């Protein structure tokens, strides 16, 4: 029996979903969440999302307060597209409100588990923050975004389980360097300075600092020192080969950032598919982060797995496309005011003569199609184990969450600050 046959049980002879479903809020919600795992050519799941979304919105005014909050949250953040720790915290609260329909013992275990992990995560954040302060790049590079707490939260979205403590430590630090690199190439460096830095990173040798400006020397030496330290640690477990793959991805990222800088300084609007999106796979930073996310993982992260991800497999391309386009949508207006490099919005408008609204609609369709590709890559057998695919999927979920309505990373003092506090600091109410 096909998995689609399960959904056909809820349709009539014409293939429409049965109207009786509209009175079952929990059933609609379950159908809505299940349909989020759709892939291409599954029209019955496309219709399920349309059907459930429409009727859940109609039901909202009639629902109890707790159920209304749960439905509203699901419509904005379906489980397949959100951060696990945030969803866990939210659903504990939702189910506490529905004591009559929930197993209280199960809720108590969930609360205990969340609290234990929260304490562990707070200790990890203290260690990361200490490292960040000792590095002192935030003070020396005042133009860069100082977001170490937000980046640790980002990392928690990739993996929160106890066994990934070392992996989280490494990935958060990589995120810090990626964020600074982005700011250097996007907002601060001149084209001449960026040319010198790009060449130095290609060489990946401390001798390459001779032509760099003072602030770039600080960044560059800090970057190389960090990767050297990671290599020394991994060498103890015969896993130092992993670092070469991570460095290679960092070089690809810098090339992509440099290409954007050249477009900007040349007042060039690139072609949407063959130029912008091709470069955007790397400029999304997801290939760099996905590769780095495996550095501190177990023996399943083999050399063959690193070779596989370095070829930009479809699941990584889909993840990167989603992250790139979501970022473009929420930062578009601000970047126009700043006179920044053309994003996918301008590229699409320029190439197809579309309005801004038409470009937004089309790009959201592209995002949904890439989610279908991503789902297919996660659900079908692959050349690497699922445990290695989860960080790729979870990086996409973080992007969906952080770039939902705004660039919550750049403007983290808005809504993101409260979410981080809820996950990392606030105790669960009894």
Curated annotation (Swiss-Prot):
Pfam families: Terpene_synth, Terpene_synth_C. Keywords: Magnesium, Metal-binding. Its cofactor is Mg(2+); Mn(2+). GO terms for molecular function: magnesium ion binding; terpene synthase activity. One of its GO terms (biological process) is diterpenoid biosynthetic process. Binds 3 Mg(2+) or Mn(2+) ions per subunit. Pathway: Secondary metabolite biosynthesis; terpenoid biosynthesis. Mg(2+) 1 binds at residues 182, 186. Gene3D superfamilies: Farnesyl Diphosphate Synthase, Terpene synthase, N-terminal domain. Mg(2+) 3 binds at residue 335. Mg(2+) 2 binds at residues 182, 186. A motif (DDXXD motif) lies at residues 182-186. Signal peptide: none annotated. The Asp-Asp-Xaa-Xaa-Asp/Glu (DDXXD/E) motif is important for the catalytic activity, presumably through binding to Mg(2+). Sesquiterpene synthase involved in the biosynthesis of volatile compounds. No activity detected with geranyl diphosphate (GPP) and farnesyl diphosphate (FPP) as substrates. Belongs to the terpene synthase family. Tpsa subfamily. This is Sesquiterpene synthase 15. It comes from Solanum lycopersicum. The gene is TPS15.
């Amino acid at each position: 029996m096909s998995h689609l046959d399960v959904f056909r049980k809820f349709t009539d002879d014409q293939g429409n979903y049965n109207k009786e479903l509209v009175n079952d809020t929990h059933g609609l919600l379950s159908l809505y969440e299940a349909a989020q795992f759709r892939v291409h050519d599954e029209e019955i799941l496309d219709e399920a999302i349309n059907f459930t979304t429409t009727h859940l919105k109609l039901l909202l005014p009639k629902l109890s307060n707790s159920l209304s909050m749960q439905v509203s949250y699901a419509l904005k953040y379906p489980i397949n597209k959100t951060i696990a720790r945030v969803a866990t915290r939210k659903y504990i609260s939702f189910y506490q409100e529905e004591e009559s329909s929930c197993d209280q013992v199960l809720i108590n275990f969930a609360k205990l588990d969340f609290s234990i992990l929260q304490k562990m995560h707070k200790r990890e954040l203290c260690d990361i923050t200490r490292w960040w302060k000792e590095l002192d790049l935030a003070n020396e590079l005042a133009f860069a975004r100082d977001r170490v707490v937000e980046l640790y939260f980002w990392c928690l979205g990739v993996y929160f389980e106890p066994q990934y403590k070392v992996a989280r430590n490494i990935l958060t630090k990589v995120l810090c360097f990626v964020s600074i690199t982005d700011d250097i190439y996007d907002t601060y460096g001149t084209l001449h300075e960026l040319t010198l830095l790009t060449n130095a990173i290609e060489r990946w040798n401390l001798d390459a600092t001779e032509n760099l400006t003072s602030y770039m020397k600080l960044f560059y030496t800090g970057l190389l020192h960090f990767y050297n330290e990671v290599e020394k640690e991994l060498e103890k477990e015969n896993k130092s080969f992993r670092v070469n793959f991570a460095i290679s991805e960092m070089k690809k990222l810098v090339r992509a950032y440099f290409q954007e800088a050249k477009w900007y300084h040349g007042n060039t609007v690139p072609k949407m598919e063959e130029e912008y999106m091709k470069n955007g796979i790397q400029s999304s930073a997801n290939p760099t982060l996905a590769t780095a996310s495996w550095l501190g993982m177990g023996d399943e992260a083999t050399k063959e797995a690193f070779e596989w991800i370095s070829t930009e497999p479809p699941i990584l391309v889909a993840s990167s496309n989603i992250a790139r386009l979501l970022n473009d949508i929420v930062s578009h207006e601000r970047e126009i005011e700043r006179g920044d490099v053309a994003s996918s919005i301008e590229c699409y408008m320029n190439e197809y003569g579309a309005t801004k609204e038409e470009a937004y609609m089309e790009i959201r369709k592209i995002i949904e199609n890439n989610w279908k590709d991503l789902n297919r890559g996660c659900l079908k057998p692959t050349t690497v184990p699922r445990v290695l695919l989860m960080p790729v999927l979870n990086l996409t979920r973080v992007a969906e969450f952080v770039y939902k309505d705004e660039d919550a990373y750049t403007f983290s003092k808005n809504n993101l600050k409260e979410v981080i506090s809820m996950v990392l600091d606030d105790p669960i109410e009894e």
